[in-house]
Amino acid sequence: MKEQMKIAIYGAGAMGTVLGGFLSDCGLDAEVDLISRNREHIRAMEEKGARILCAATGDTYTKQVNALLPEEMTEQYDVIFLMTKQKDNARTAGFLKNFLKADGALVSAQNGLPEELLAEIVGEDRVYGAVCAWGANLVGDGTAELTSDPSAMTMEIGSWSGRCGKLKEIREILSAVGEVTGNPAFVTVTENLAGARWSKLAINAAFSGLSVVTGLTFGEIAKGRKSRALALGILRECFAVASELGVKLEKIQGHDMEKLLGAPGFFGTQKALFLL
């Protein structure tokens, strides 16, 4: 009999709670653990389940989940989705290495460019990236607000080493989330992970900081003459650095990064609450 797959969401904050909640209730033949250092959040999910509030539709979902503190981990996992802030990645990866099966996959769903450091610690063939084009806020213990429409959420995944490895399995796992949310386009595979990373990084660099400082939505920044000029300058600098590194930028949800400010509608309902 085939052993049941074991999946961990390490860093089950806002986005980790959303992803882990859907993965726990999408029909996968897998054991899914949501792991966080936030004791109150973990205990609330243990007692009442993970609550997901969908801002776009007004729906509320309650998902029964396995919730753990890091010190309560005992299993080795086939796939670990890393969803913490990457400032502690060296320590976190060193810790998680002990909980990853020999053929396991560490999938960074973080912002920035985390894969190189992770690969140095756990091995390049075990490292994958997932670029998330959706957002969430933690609004209470055990409760996350999904700020994106479930039908428009996407995750673009790729292998750091360029070899397929467990990419097919990771895609199948995330495709199950697409099925339960009615979003067949939820997960796509890219052969240009670096390009996808740099595209997301450019958006965050150009819009997130300005959004925090001004209180404007991404769409308002793109429409305003002065804010648009600032964002465009930052984007150009990101494009130039990526080009020098030999990176070809990927589209995000079909939007060409080079034409981003000419079509701001995609960002109209987005708002950055934190510097990412």
Q: Where are the language model's segments positioned?
A:
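A structural signal for isolated positions on well-ordered beta-strands in alpha/beta enzyme cores
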Residues: 8, 31-33, 107, 128, ...
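NAD(P)+-binding Rossmann beta1-loop-alpha1 motif at the extreme N-terminus of oxidoreductases
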Residues: 2-57
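Short, charged/polar "capping" segments at the starts of alpha-helices
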Residues: 40-44, 115-117, 165-166
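Internal alpha-helical scaffold of NAD(P)-dependent oxidoreductase catalytic cores
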Residues: 99, 121-126, 143-255
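Nucleotide donor/acceptor-binding cores
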Residues: 5, 78, 153
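Rossmann-like NAD(P)(H) cofactor-binding subdomain of soluble oxidoreductases
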Residues: 59-145
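C-terminal active-site/capping subdomain that shapes the small-molecule cofactor and substrate pocket
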Residues: 249-276
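N-terminal glycine-rich dinucleotide-binding loop that anchors FAD/FMN and/or NAD(P) in oxidoreductases
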Residues: 50-67, 204
